[in-house]
Amino acid sequence: MCEDSGADMITVHGRTRDKIYAGEVNYAEVERVKYAVHIPVIANGGIFCREDAENLMERTGADGVMVARGAMYSPWIFAEITGGPQPDRRALVLKQLDDTLALFGERFALVFMRKMAAFYTKGKRNSSALREQLFMCDSVEKLREMIEAAEF
């Protein structure tokens, strides 16, 4: 239907709406779409690292992947997936802080970047204690110091 209507590409999420973020990606359904059309199919669902992207493409025959939540935890995932040079993660987070501050002001930047820094440090050494400190942080200056000292 999409292809017949002129679509140049289709993106398919491997979970139904009722599954939201839980459960396994339905590789068979993505693969079924891939082989039912003659246009590129981009697969989405459960991509948090390069291996996830490769697995999704291998198991479905998809032409590419779309990253969603995985990019919230790891905005550097795109360089990882493509094999490109890895960015300086700390510098990237500090730039995001500066950009958010410039666009939205101190209050929003503080709340937003505490949340984002917590995402970025998940699973790292001492990340639980760091997240507690992040959420108690009450100034952009202190937040900047914490980001400069954190492991990403």
Where are these regions (language model features)?
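Short beta-strands and strand-loop turn motifs
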Residues: 11-15
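Alpha/beta catalytic cores of nucleotide-metabolism and tRNA/nucleoside-modifying enzymes
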Residues: 1-9, 21, 28, 32-43, ...
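Short, small-residue-enriched loops and turns at beta-alpha junctions
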Residues: 16-23
